[in-house]
Amino acid sequence: SCNAQNGNPNEGGIATDAAAETGTVQIGYAGSNWGAAAVYNYSNGVGPASGTPLAVLSGSGIDGAYFESVNSVGLSAYWQPSTSGWVPSISVGWGINSYNQGDTAFDYDGAASQSWYVGLQWDDAFIKGNALGMAVGQPTFITSCGDICKEFGKDGNTPYDAGYAWEWWYKFQVTDNISVTPAIFYLSNPL
């Protein structure tokens, strides 16, 4: 707990109404060449937001606009071909967060954010032991911002702050224990 050292149960402590806590439950399964997982997280006492400019604005502490709690769900999966070749291994993931606020001058409840990615990797690309890969996705971005967007003339349910992140890499297997992986990154909407 970030405020466990405060013994006043109205301001902190452990397992009190004012304590900040988090809990996570995850389940997963893996077969011989595939796997899938799901996760749920609840966090209380989240505090000020960080991230994209809109995320910071909607939970920045201005007028008491701190996020009080967040419920998060994530899903991920992967599949690998039984033999390497032209068919790549595939990894996918998606997550969503739903934010709730405490007492504030604005009603920002209803804020939500999401993220996703898709990754492809070709093993034994060009030379046995090397790998070529790419990934694309959107880092966490606001998909619904409740009343804070209405304050700025937005509809509150349109994705904002969305940008794409791309990565391309090639792994050179130098020895059995050493590999070198140069990569190129592209961000369509850097902070």
What residue spans do the PLM features occupy?
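C-terminal structural cap/anchor segments
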Residues: W94, S98-E151, P159-D161
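Residues that define the transmembrane beta-barrel architecture of outer-membrane proteins
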Residues: A19-G23, S69-V73, G110-W116, A162-W166, ...
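Transmembrane beta-strands of outer-membrane beta-barrel pores
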Residues: C2-N6, G31-N33, Y42-V46, W94-N100, ...
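Outer-membrane beta-barrel translocator domains and adjoining extracellular loop/strand segments
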Residues: C2-T16, G47-A65, N97-S113, T143-E151, ...
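Repeated loop/turn-to-beta-strand initiation elements of outer-membrane beta-barrel proteins
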Residues: G23, Y29, N33-A38, G45-V46, ...
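Extracellular low-complexity, Gly/Ser/Thr-rich intrinsically disordered linkers
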Residues: C145, G156-L191
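Aromatic- and glycine-enriched pocket-lining scaffold segments that form the walls
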Residues: S1-A30, Y164
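Residues on the lipid-exposed face of transmembrane beta-strands in outer-membrane beta-barrel proteins
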Residues: V25-Y29, L75-W79, V118-W122, W168-V174, ...
